[in-house]
Amino acid sequence: MTKNFIVTLKKNTPDVEAKKFLDSVHHAGGSIVHKFDIIKGYTIKVPDVLHLNKLKEKHNDVIENVEEDKEVHTN
C-alpha cells in the first residue's frame, strides 16, 4: 500500500546529495509529491514501509526527520 511521507533533509545537505536522495526515491518505485521551498524537504510517495526503510538506511547521513503525511486536527 503506497503511503506519503514528509522527509526533511539536514540544513547543510549539499544539493548533489539531495539529488541522490531524490534519485533513490524514484529508483525505489516512489515519486516526489511536493518540494518545500523554505526548508530542504519533500513529500514522497513510496510503495511500502520497506522501501522507506531502505531509503532511510541509504541516506541516513542527510535525513533529519521522516514522518507520515496525514491530516492534522486541532481541538
From Swiss-Prot:
SUPFAM superfamilies registered for this protein in UniProt: Protease propeptides/inhibitors (SSF54897)
Localization: Cytoplasm; Nucleus
One Gene Ontology cellular component annotation held by this UniProt entry: nucleus
Modified residues (Phosphothreonine): 74
Gene Ontology MF terms in the entry: serine-type endopeptidase inhibitor activity
Alphabetically ordered keywords of this record: Cytoplasm, Nucleus, Phosphoprotein, Protease inhibitor, Protein transport, Serine protease inhibitor, Transport
GO biological process annotation, one example: vacuole fusion, non-autophagic
Additional information: Originally, 2 inhibitors of protease B, inhibitor I(B)2 and inhibitor I(B)1, have been isolated from commercial baker's yeast, which consists of both S.cerevisiae and S.carlsbergensis. It has been shown that S.cerevisiae only produces inhibitor 2, and S.carlsbergensis only produces inhibitor 1. A sequence for inhibitor 2 can be found in strain S288c (AC P0CT04).
Role played: Cytosolic inhibitor of vacuolar proteinase B (yscB), probably regulating protease B activity during limited proteolysis. PBI2 is a component of the LMA1 complex, which is involved in the facilitation of vesicle fusion such as homotypic vacuole and ER-derived COPII vesicle fusion with the Golgi.
The protein's assembly and partners: Part of the heterodimeric LMA1 complex together with the thioredoxin II/TRX2. LMA1 binds to the ATPase SEC18.
Record-stated family: Belongs to the protease inhibitor I9 family.
PANTHER family xrefs: PROTEASE B INHIBITOR 2
Stated name of the protein: Protease B inhibitor 1
Origin organism lineage: Eukaryota, Fungi, Dikarya, Ascomycota, Saccharomycotina
